[in-house]
Each structure stands twice: as structure tokens, then as C-alpha cells.
Amino acid sequence: RMDQLLVTLSEQAIQRAAPQPGERVLDIGCGCGSTSLTMAGQGARVTGVDISEPMLANARARSAGNEMLEFILADASSHPFDTRFDLAFSRFGVMFFADPHQAFAHIRSAIQDQGRLCFICWQSPKDNPWLSVPGGAAQPFLPEPEAQPDPRAPGPFAFADPAYVQEILDQAGFTSIAIEPCSADMRLGSDVEEAVAFLLRNGPMSRVLAEVDEDLRNKALDAVRETLAPLATAEGIMLSGACWIASANQG
């Protein structure tokens, strides 16, 4: 379901990364393997890494018999790769490192001298209506956070500030760094109930709703339904998502 939501953004990121036939590609945080399969389909030899064994089992099942792909249970920030890659790529997989400066220095060491890096990450929640619109509707019924979270703490939006991303990559030794905006319409579901079910499983609102009592949860969800109902189209519930695509050379 998440792969379906991200299909347009994935296409934009892979187009920017431009994997070539015969290139060795490292897919960081590959999850269930969708981006790895796409790049292998373009002729690249792909090594997908993730820290989730269930997701990797799914990826291996989807790619059974495909000799262009391998999947490793590993943390890309520290794994001793036995090859150097032409391209290190990630779709929403690099914002969770405890020490991003160290992580990107290590990733750079796994890239060939003439190689490159390309990843896509989220802009801030307020710039992502697919989250901020339902989140804003639910907010009056949810508890205030005890403290303002560190916007750069590991998590989906840790790289929302492009200046921070630039500084991390620069310090890691990358060159020709470019950070470009991209956006796409996100299909949350075919109708309101499917969209609500999706939001209950994904995103920051799902975690908060899991912790409140049933009465508040129901009020919050009713408010979300009321907000999403006028947005229904023939294509489903569509709201925009905003990201950065970062690219850089190894040296």
C-alpha cells in the first residue's frame, strides 16, 4: 500500500539517480524491494539493504530467480560492504541514522571514486498536505506533546531542512551537492474510509491515536472523515506530498 502511495515520487527519484545497465547500485532502506526491482529492471546490479527481516523476506520472494538482485539484512551506516558501488540510492531510508554525519561518511566509503549518491526525503510535515490536512483535523482531540521534538532527531522528517542535508553531505566529503524540490499527488485511498484506515497504519498521527482513549480517538477520526469527504474525487482521496531529492558525487 505504501509502495502504491509513493510510486510517482519513486519514479522521480530513480529518474534523477539514472542507474545505468551494468552499474552496481546500493539501495539503502530498500524495504520490500520495489525500488531495487525497478533499478534491476533497468539493467543495474542491485544490493538492497534494510534492517527489517520481514520486509527483506518479502523483497526476496518478489525477486526470486532474478540474478541482478541481492538483499542483505544490515545497517548501511556501519555494514562492511565487500564491494564499492557506482550509485548509492535511497527512497526515504536515510533519515533514521542515529549519527547521520558518520553514516554518510561510511556510505561514501562504499561508493566508487567516480560514483554518486541520490536519495529522496520528506520536506516538513506542514509542507505535506497528505499529512498536515488530516493531522490538523485530528489535532484538537489529541494531547499536546510534552516537549517540542528536535526537528533533526532521527525520523521521517529529520532531513526537512535542506541546509542541514547540505552540511551533512559536505562534511562527509561529497561534492557537486544538489538538493531539489519535488512533489506529487498522493492517493490516500479510493474513498474516505480507506484513507482513514491508511492513516491509522502510517505516519505520525497513527502513533498518537494509538495512545489516546477510544472516545477521543473516535472524535479525532470523525473530524478527519469530515475534512477528507469534500476532497473525494473519481481517482480517490488525493493530497499533495513534498520532498527533496538530494544528489552528490563521491569526490
Give names to the regions the model predicted:
Residues 101, 116-189, 206:
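Conserved catalytic/acceptor-binding region of the Class I
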Residues 97-98, 111-113:
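Helix-to-beta-strand junctions that scaffold the AdoMet/dcAdoMet cofactor pocket
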